[in-house]
């Protein structure tokens, strides 16, 4: 495998980079191979990983617990599945440095700025930093706000959102498409400005170029009515020309029940008569029934699944805003971290069969074993963390699986289970 070749011959500049590579690099290589990337493209993306992601993982093991994964790891691999195409590999990533969480950089701003600067030098296809700069200006703490938050006690243990920004990388066609993420929680704590107001202000300022305010207003009306905004809400965008980018709003909800999912999918009934929304809801309900998720109110308070077994993870919601679209497009992330991995893989395979995706249905359980050859998936419960689903009229169903993304168990545990 290409990752094995690089492990043997690459001279890593620091011990931390070598340790992170051994923990995340071969696994990344197995994801590339399992998803069907050719050998040339595997090398291409592995080199991108080594040159750009590895130096931004910071000290090993990580001292900063990232908000982007259930275990606090700063990196997450995911696979997207659609009709008549091989899986698409993505990387979610919060850059870290030796200063992250220290008095020099208590809220981890330095590493993100350094990585953005590095990406700007790579001449990535259609890469644009306008929206990244916009949202970091809107949500990142100023010096005075950081000092104010420190006086309030800073980040309170493990129970509060710690991250301010993150990146996503879609690996398709030999290219790297970059996404940005900005979290509103710390700004809310430092300033007292409600999260919904912070997000509304940031989007209103983009209206002359993005023309999505009407769609956002439908979403915001529902969020205000249902008290849906909270410290875990965040914004995402494509790092392309501002007039072509999508915006996505994310958040969590502890009511893991079908009634709440249906309510949120239809924005409290506001878009329930739309044919695409109806079709998507029917498919979503079928996936829900296959996964057999235990219904109830979760006690998620911002901790990490490595500490609580994963059974308290909430639902994640996501609404996409597109230029000229009359309403937001919903996506839901069902928590499966803490559920038996073999059973989850069988449920995913059954759902693929229901969709008529026979190749994906046949290959998925084998793919999971190929990615984690040293794990007995009939015994593990933490390899698959989330399953997301969306539906639109043009491309049909759209399903992604998010995975535990390191070779070693999280935070010094003796086993991944």
Swiss-Prot record:
Listed A to Z, the keywords are: Prenyltransferase, Transferase
Q: What does this protein do?
A: Prenyltransferase; part of the gene cluster that mediates the biosynthesis of echinulin family alkaloid. The pathway begins with the biosynthesis of the cyclic dipeptide cyclo-L-Trp-L-Ala (cyclo-TA) by the NRPS echPS via condensation of L-alanine and L-tryptophan. The prenyltransferase echPT1 then catalyzes the first prenylation step, a reverse prenylation reaction at C2, to yield preechinulin. Preechinulin is the substrate of the cytochrome P450 monooxygenase echP450 that catalyzes the formation of the double bond between C10 and C11 to produce neoechulin A.
Question: The organism sits in which domain of life?
Answer: Eukaryota
Q: Name one GO molecular function term.
A: prenyltransferase activity
* Protein's gene: echPT1
User: Which positions in this protein are listed as binding dimethylallyl diphosphate?
Assistant: 90, 179, 181, 248, 250, 333, 398, 402
Pathway(s) served: Secondary metabolite biosynthesis; Alkaloid biosynthesis
According to its UniProt entry, one GO biological process term is: alkaloid metabolic process
* Source species: Aspergillus ruber (strain CBS 135680)
The record's listing under Pfam families reads:
Trp_DMAT (PF11991)
Q: Where is this site: Required for regioselectivity?
A: 92
Question: Which InterPro entries does the UniProt record give?
Answer: Aro_prenylTrfase, Aro_prenylTrfase_DMATS, DMATS-type_fun
The keyword Transferase belongs to this UniProt entry's keyword annotation: yes
Q: What name does the UniProt record give this protein?
A: Echinulin prenyltransferase 1
Catalytic reaction(s) noted: cyclo(L-tryptophyl-L-alanyl) + dimethylallyl diphosphate = preechinulin + diphosphate
């Amino acid at each position: 495998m290409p990752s094995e070749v690089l492990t043997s011959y690459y001279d890593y500049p620091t011990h931390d980079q070598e340790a992170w590579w051994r923990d995340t690099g071969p696994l990344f290589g197995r994801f590339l191979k399992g998803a069907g990337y050719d050998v040339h493209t595997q090398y291409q993306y592995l080199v991108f990983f080594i040159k750009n992601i590895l130096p931004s993982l910071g000290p090993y093991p990580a001292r900063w617990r990232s908000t982007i994964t259930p275990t606090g790891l700063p990196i997450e691999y995911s696979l997207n599945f659609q009709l008549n195409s091989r899986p698409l590999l993505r990387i979610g990533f919060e850059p870290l440095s030796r200063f992250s969480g220290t008095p020099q950089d208590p809220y981890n701003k330095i590493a993100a700025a350094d990585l953005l600067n590095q990406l700007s030098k790579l001449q990535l296809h259609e890469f644009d930093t306008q929206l990244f700069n916009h949202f970091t200006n809107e949500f990142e703490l100023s010096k005075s706000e950081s000092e104010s938050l420190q006086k309030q006690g800073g980040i309170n243990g493990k129970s509060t959102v710690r991250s301010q920004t993150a990146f996503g990388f879609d690996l398709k066609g030999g290219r790297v498409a970059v996404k940005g993420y900005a979290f509103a929680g710390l700004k809310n704590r430092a300033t007292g400005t409600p999260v919904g107001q912070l997000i509304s202000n940031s989007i209103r300022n983009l209206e002359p170029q993005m023309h999505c305010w009407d769609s956002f207003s439908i979403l915001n009306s529902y969020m205000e009515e249902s008290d849906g905004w909270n410290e875990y809400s965040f914004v995402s965008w494509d790092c392309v020309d501002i007039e072509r980018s999508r915006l996505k709003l994310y958040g969590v909800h502890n009511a893991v029940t079908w009634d709440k999912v249906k309510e949120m999918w239809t924005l409290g009934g506001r878009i329930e008569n739309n044919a695409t929304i109806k079709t998507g809801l029917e498919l979503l309900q079928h996936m829900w029934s296959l996964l057999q998720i235990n219904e109830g109110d979760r006690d998620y308070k911002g901790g990490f699944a490595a500490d609580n077994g994963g059974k308290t993870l909430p639902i994640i919601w996501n609404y996409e805003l597109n230029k000229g679209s009359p309403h937001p497009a919903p996506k839901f992330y069902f928590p499966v971290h803490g559920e038996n991995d073999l059973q989850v893989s069988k449920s995913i395979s059954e759902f693929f069969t229901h969709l008529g995706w026979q190749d994906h249905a046949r290959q998925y359980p084998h793919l999971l074993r190929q990615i984690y050859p040293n794990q007995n998936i009939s015994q593990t419960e933490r390899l698959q963390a989330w399953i997301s689903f969306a539906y639109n009229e043009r491309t049909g169903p759209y399903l992604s699986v998010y995975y535990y993304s390191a070779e070693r168990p999280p935070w010094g545990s003796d086993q991944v289970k």
